Curated annotation (Swiss-Prot):
Main location: cytoplasm
Pathway: Carbohydrate degradation; glycolysis; pyruvate from D-glyceraldehyde 3-phosphate: step 2/5
Protein name listed in UniProt: Phosphoglycerate kinase
InterPro entries associated with the record: Phosphoglycerate_kinase, Phosphoglycerate_kinase_CS, Phosphoglycerate_kinase_N, Phosphoglycerate_kinase_sf
GO-annotated cellular components: cytosol
Length: 400
């Protein structure tokens, strides 16, 4: 057996603590934060460190900047965090430059410093040892509370852990909660266990689907990825999204499900249009009658009813991936309805981060879900049974 090094086991008193957070939050065109859930999720760990008299250095990425640009600055995050905590947050002008180093070295007990966007440093995504060493030199203790990036071997996630021994590094409360939830979900789900998998591509979820099959009782497949499965069953899908090279794999999954006695549900109708836009003329059509030149962009009302029926006796529901192009209003109905049904069920409901969390927030159902993961990719990889680069260095065999 193995366990995770925890923030609770570290002597934090008056220490300088580096916390890797995930403040990769959505913003509108005026850079206003539209959903601060990830910022709020980090507060318990930050508060715990402050209560122990720590000087707290926070670090995160935001977006995928190719260069240093003000639209990727963490300044709006600093302001929102300060408001949420009713406490000043000092903002550094850089990551490991003169300003950051000066502010980090002068940081006093119970003060908070937020470094600028980690990805302004090219070495972050390259897992660069030198960057990791520079970041590590700022603090006595390292805490990872950024589940959303734990599947990435990045400098502030993996390389940095080499510069702290086991008594000076650990997982924050959010990271521990995420890992606990995912492993319990896979090892001890209340049954029937229903997985709802959507999103655009089969390729990104192939491994998760294969891994889930022996564990679930029912599997609902929606979103753009459903068309590869429908094509595998011999349907004409018009111009709908198709991964031609994965038709064979889709067939294998359908066959494996059958052999395991897992009931697999695919859409029976779709909301179709000729273009993917708000102005497009749309119509509901059975999956066997999608016209040439048209594409399915959401599940239709009959699919919604079928999926609702499939969810009716569920005791555990894991949902990862929207049912359609939810960013466009007229193609969001299937995803919104699914969100309502899942939130109204009596099951333990786990939402696998990313776009799905956005759908749930838009539907106004966030408070009704049992658990909303802060990381889409990371939660998928945990479900796939993979070891996460950010978690592995914080994991010890219980005999150690």
């Amino acid at each position: 057996m193995s366990s995770i090094l925890s923030i609770k086991d570290i002597d934090l008193a008056k220490k300088k603590v580096f916390i890797r957070c995930d403040f990769n939050v959505p913003q509108d065109e005026f850079l206003n934060i539209t959903d601060d859930r990830r910022i709020r999720s980090a507060i318990p760990t930050i508060r715990y460190c402050l209560d122990n008299g720590c000087a707290v250095i926070l670090a995160s990425h935001l977006g995928r900047p190719k260069e240093i640009a003000s639209k990727y600055s963490l300044e709006p995050v600093a302001k929102r965090l300060a408001r949420l905590m009713a406490k000043d947050v000092i903002m550094a002008k850089d990551v490991i430059g003169e300003d950051a180093k000066k502010k980090a070295s002068e940081l006093k007990s119970s003060e908070i410093l937020l470094l600028e966007n980690l990805r302004f440093e090219k070495g972050e995504t390259k897992n660069d040892e030198n960057l990791a060493k520079e970041l590590a030199s700022m603090a006595d203790v390292y805490i990872n509370d950024a589940f959303g990036v734990c599947h990435r071997a990045h400098a502030s996630v993996e390389a940095i852990t080499k510069y702290f021994d086991n008594t000076h590094k650990g997982a924050g409360f959010l990271l521990q909660k995420e890992i606990e939830f995912a492993s319990n979900l896979i090892k001890h789900p209340a049954r029937p266990f229903v997985a709802v998998v959507g999103g655009s591509k089969v390729s990104g979820k192939l491994q998760a689907l294969t891994n889930l099959l022996p564990k679930v009782d029912k599997l609902i497949i929606g979103g753009g990825m459903a068309f590869t499965f429908l094509k595998a069953q011999g349907y004409d899908i018009g111009n709908s999204l198709l991964e031609e090279d994965l038709i064979e794999e889709a067939n294998k999954i359908l066959l494996k499900g059958k052999n395991l006695g897992v009931k697999i549900y695919l859409p029976v109708d779709v909301t179709a249009a000729q273009t993917c836009s708000q102005e497009a003329v749309m119509k509901y059509t059975p999956v066997q009658e999608i016209p040439a030149g048209w594409m399915g962009l959401d599940i239709g009302p009959a699919s919604v009813r079928l999926f609702k029926e499939a969810l009716s006796d569920a005791q555990t529901i894991w949902w990862n991936g929207p049912m359609g192009v939810f960013e466009i209003d007229k193609f969001s109905k299937g995803s919104i309805k699914m969100s309502h049904y899942i939130s109204e069920s009596h099951a333990t409901t786990v939402i696998g981060g990313g776009d799905t969390a956005d759908v749930v927030a838009r539907a106004g159902d966030a408070d009704e879900m049992t658990f909303i993961s802060t990381g889409g990719g990371a939660s998928l990889e945990l479900i796939e049974g993979k070891e996460l680069p950010g978690v592995k260095p914080l994991t010890i065999k219980d005999s150690e």
